[in-house]
């Protein structure tokens, strides 16, 4: 099977934003009112300013999500499985005023939630979707992933952080739920070789101890 990847957002200079400005939060001159990104966190003190135009979810809802249905339908003509990047944005999305230099002035807005995916399923039938649910997660995001029935993601490279205690990491294989897809890494990660060379000696020991212990358990 072929797994295709689509982002939640499109670019400001995309054909979609040009042909259908009514789908996005734009002013009368088609200038964004706000843009997408992520809030400040432990990795970036100023957050992430992506700059994509945000959706007018009220308009999408009133049109029965036809644009999204068309988008997903086309993707399934190309792929057997579709992974949706930044799935948490369907629960809540981060809105940053247009013109800001970083993401510190942004705030969370409510997304369409499960309603979007119910409408897609009604139109297209059940389809295989992977929900990219990495990063900042809340109970409401986890509930949306659960309610959708889509498998979430687990990334092995995240499992051996020396700051985590014991075997508590959600990314350790023995903690995986049944409904998930496991990756060694994603497009945002190092290759396995690059990752192995970049981690600390303590983290390499964690990985060796864990993987060797589980290999011995399998042999028994």
Model-assigned labels for residue ranges:
Residues 5:
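Ligand-binding beta-strand-loop-alpha-helix segment within the catalytic cores
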Residues 1, 9-218:
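Alpha-amylase-like alpha-glycosidases and glucanotransferases acting on alpha-linked glucans and related
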């Amino acid at each position: 099977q072929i797994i295709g990847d689509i982002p939640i957002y499109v670019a400001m200079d995309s054909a979609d934003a040009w042909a259908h400005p009514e789908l996005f939060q734009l002013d009368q001159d088609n200038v964004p009112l706000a843009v997408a990104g992520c809030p400040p966190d432990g990795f970036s003190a100023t957050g992430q300013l992506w700059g994509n135009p945000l959706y007018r979810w009220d308009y999408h809802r009133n049109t029965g999500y036809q644009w999204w249905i068309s988008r997903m339908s086309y993707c399934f003509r190309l792929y057997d499985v579709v992974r949706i990047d930044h799935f948490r944005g369907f629960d809540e999305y981060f809105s940053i005023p247009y013109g800001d230099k970083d993401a510190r002035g942004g705030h969370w807005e409510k997304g369409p939630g499960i309603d979007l995916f119910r409408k897609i399923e009604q139109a297209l039938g059940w389809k295989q979707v992977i929900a990219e649910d990495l990063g900042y997660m809340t109970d409401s995001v986890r509930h949306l992933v659960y309610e959708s029935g889509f498998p979430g993601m687990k990334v092995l490279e995240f499992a051996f952080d020396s700051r985590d205690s014991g075997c508590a990491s959600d990314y350790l294989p023995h903690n995986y739920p049944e409904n998930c897809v496991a990756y060694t890494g994603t497009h945002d990660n190092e290759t396995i070789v690059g990752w192995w060379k970049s981690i600390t000696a303590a983290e390499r020991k964690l990985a060796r101890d864990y993987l060797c212990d589980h290999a011995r358990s399998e042999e028994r």
